């Protein structure tokens, strides 16, 4: 994302932005918090950190267990230690949906400076930068990585002005919305195709499909597959 030049700037910028990105410690940007749920939040406010939505099917053993949950407020970030091909050391996820609660296994950090929520949604989750940061402030276990919060807060990151954050955040969020819209269109087309297949082909034991194009009225003929195919034998020399 950043150029290889000595100047701390990205290769692509919006017009009007020329100053260097500022070197900051994460401790200048975030503070670690541990705000426990006092039952102000119930089951319907449990957030899936991995997918960032309220879990409609969430279950807990009893109401008292909800007191172990951490409050996760809008704009805060949580560390998810699951390793994957995309995130070698786990990742940070920003809360962009609203206040709620998450399991106590997730460490939560609150922003302490003015920021653009959408810029940080993508920047704090950007593996080429954050992967290097997390490689130095996490400890590996068999399935997950554990964050060492004090080491994370000492790490350095380059940060643009708030105005540039907003421009970048708007662009990336707009692209995300467009991708989501196209995914929905694709899903709808797949459903339509599935429905058409059921109507364009006859059901088992029948010779007429439910839907036909104008001018086609004859029954479909019963034929053996051998009438349409030739067997090809492939020999491999030992």
Per-region residue spans from a language model:
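Amphipathic alpha-helical segments with low aromatic content
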Residues: 1-22, 155, 161-221
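Non-catalytic DNA-recognition/assembly elements of restriction-modification systems
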Residues: 13-36, 212-236
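DNA target-recognition patches
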Residues: 27-64, 100, 226-229, 237-238
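Basic chromatin DNA-binding modules
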Residues: 1, 26, 139-142, 156, ...
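A short beta-sheet element
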Residues: 49, 57, 61, 68-130, ...
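C-terminal accessory/regulatory regions appended to core domains
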Residues: 30, 64, 73-74, 109, ...
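A short glycine-rich beta-alpha junction/loop motif
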Residues: 6-10, 100-105, 139-163
């Amino acid at each position: 994302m950043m150029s290889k030049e000595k100047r701390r700037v990205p290769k692509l910028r919006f017009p009007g932005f020329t100053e260097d990105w500022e070197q900051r410690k994460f401790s200048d940007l975030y503070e670690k918090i541990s705000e426990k749920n006092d039952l102000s939040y119930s089951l319907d406010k449990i957030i899936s950190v991995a997918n960032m939505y309220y879990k409609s099917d969430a279950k807990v053993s009893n109401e008292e267990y909800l007191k172990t949950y951490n409050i996760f407020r809008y704009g805060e970030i949580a560390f998810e230690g699951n390793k994957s091909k995309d995130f070698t050391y786990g990742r940070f996820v920003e809360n962009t949906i609203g206040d709620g609660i998450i399991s106590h296994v997730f460490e939560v950090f609150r922003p302490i400076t003015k920021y653009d929520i959408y810029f940080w949604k993508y920047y704090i989750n950007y593996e080429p930068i954050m992967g290097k940061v997390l490689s130095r402030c996490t400890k590996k276990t068999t399935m997950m990585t554990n964050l060492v919060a004090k080491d994370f807060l000492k790490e350095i990151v380059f940060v643009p002005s708030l105005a540039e954050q907003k421009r970048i955040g708007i662009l990336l969020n707009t692209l995300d919305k467009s991708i989501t819209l196209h995914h929905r269109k694709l899903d709808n087309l797949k459903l339509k195709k599935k429905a058409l297949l059921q109507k364009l082909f006859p059901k088992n034991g029948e010779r007429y499909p439910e839907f036909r194009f104008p001018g086609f009225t004859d029954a479909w003929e019963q034929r053996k597959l051998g009438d349409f195919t030739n067997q090809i034998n492939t020999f491999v020399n030992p």
